[in-house]
Structures are given as C-alpha cells and as structure tokens.
A protein has these predicted regions:
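Conserved short-loop catalytic and cofactor-binding motifs
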Residues: 5, 54-58, 132
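Non-catalytic alpha-helical coupling and interface elements of nucleotide-dependent molecular machines
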Residues: 21-29, 75
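Active-site diphosphate/adenylate-binding microenvironment
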Residues: 40-122
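Secondary-structure boundary/capping signal
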Residues: 28, 78, 125-126
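Flexible, glycine/charged-enriched surface loops at secondary-structure junctions
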Residues: 27-42
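General structural feature for long, well-ordered alpha-helical segments within catalytic domains
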Residues: 4, 9-16, 20, 34, ...
Length: 185
C-alpha cells in the first residue's frame, strides 16, 4: 500500500502467476549469455578474493583471512555481528540474516552487546562478535562477559587488536587532518 505501482494488473492471482512465469521464463532463456558472463565474472572475483584472503595467513593475520576462517567454522545457523573486523566479501555465509553491521548512526561498542541479544533470542544459535580493540572497550566488556557467563550464552568474541582506535582516529582526521590527533599513534 505504501509503494507506488507503475502498472496494476487485476485478475486471478494463480492465473496471473502462471502467465508471469511463462513470460519470464522466455525472457530468461534469451539472456543466457548475459547470465553466463555474470557467473564467470562472479567466479573470477571470488577466486581473487580467496587468493587475497590466503595471502593474509600469517602473523599478524589479515582481516580478510580472519573473516574467511570465521566463515569456515560457521554452521548453518550461526550469526556474526561485525564491528570493524570481518569484511563481508571474504565470507561465504550459509543463508540470509547471518551478517550484521553497526547502524549508520554510529555506535562503537555495538557488536558485542548485539551478539548477546542474538544469543538471548535463540540460545541454540552461535553468535559471533567480531570487533576491533576500541569497539571491544566501548562495549563495556566486563558487563558483557558477566552476562554471557551467568546466562551460559553461546557466544564467540573475536577481538582484532591493531593497537589503535582506528575508527576514532579516522573520524578525527577527517575533520581535523592537521590537528593534534594527526600527531598521535
């Protein structure tokens, strides 16, 4: 009701769906070359990403390699709450609603508590919080770990420690590139 319609087709829903299926099937067969080229490009991209992730298998490991490894251990129901740690392109998720990012309104420290919320919603589902060291600190980790432990929640917390609060640093440098923050860390 709240979306504008370009074309309304009144009629019997079952008959309309059969007709649409026939029409769309004909169009799909006409576009097979395009689908094939898109699949080829997608496969090549995935291969490039896998190579890039593998290159980060060292000490310290890259975010790409860590994301690939986390993706490998996730079962069909696991969910990840990413806060500046696990880049999605390097993950092979098993279905929808498996990967969450912080809201655009901000929220350093969002990942760990959000993962706890997912655990509370379904105690049989592994929740993974993948956060940077600054995000971890802003999450009030003592309280989060106490809640997780006292309620026996199935959570895995991965903290990527780069020794700097990069999100804060990037924000400060974006506003004040020559300010005091540019001389720190």
């Amino acid at each position: 009701r709240s979306f504008q319609s370009d074309l309304a087709i009144p009629g019997d829903m079952a008959a309309a769906m059969r007709w649409m299926h026939e029409e769309l099937s004909e169009r799909a067969s006409k576009n097979q070359n395009r689908y094939d080229s898109l699949k080829e490009a997608s496969d090549a991209r995935r291969e490039t990403l896998a190579t890039r992730a593998e290159a980060g298998n060292g000490s310290p490991m890259s975010h790409a390699w860590m994301a690939k490894c986390v993706s490998d251990i996730m079962d069909d129901e696991a969910v990840i709450f990413n806060e500046l740690g696990a880049p999605l392109p390097f993950m092979d998720l098993k279905g929808p609603n498996r990967y969450f990012n912080p809201p655009h309104s901000g929220g350093l420290g969002w990942g760990f508590p959000a993962a706890l919320g997912a655990c509370l919603a379904d105690k049989n589902r592994l929740a993974i919080a993948c956060v940077g060291d600054g995000s971890y600190t802003f999450a009030n980790p003592l309280a989060c770990h106490m809640i997780s432990n006292s309620l026996d929640l199935p959570i895995l917390v991965i903290v990527l420690n780069n020794g700097v609060w990069n999100a804060v640093r990037r924000a400060a440098l974006a506003l004040y590139p020559d300010g005091q923050a540019s001389k720190m860390n």
